[in-house]
Amino acid sequence: AIAVIANSKNANTCNANGVEIAEETSKLVASALGIKPEEVIVASTGVIGEPMSIEPFQTGIPNLAKQLSAEGHTDAATAIMTTDTVKKEVAVSFMIQGKKCTLGGMAKGSGMIHPNMATTLNFITTDVCISAALIQKALSEIVKITYNCLTIDGDTSTNDMVSVMA
């Protein structure tokens, strides 16, 4: 994936039009950024089972695309907060064979329990040159001992996710 679009207030799951809304959202983002719809990750958090309208995406995505910048990480980390009391973002640089590499991440999730679940959304990016198979293996292994150990109320949300883009 090349882009992520996240919304809050509506989980876009267990409703009549969730798949269609997600597909149309990815098309809108792709059009605004000049990429393919399959290169867009769509993430949603909020109330489960509510109908969702495409209209906020139709009006909001063009404006969001214009505001994209390399310095926008803090705005993005703040924007995905729901009941979080602090934004969660980090970036580190390190050397691999004499080349400077960067790994960054942001997350949303704290104690949002409505209805009876908590959603965490996690987005990791890196400029490390790594194959899709190797990064998937690394992500799967680390998720087992970190992300999958989180619990707030004992339930997994329909929308919990962690993604990595390299």
PLM segments and residue spans:
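A structural signal for small-residue-enriched, beta-sheet-centric alpha/beta enzyme cores
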Residues: 1-20, 24, 30-166
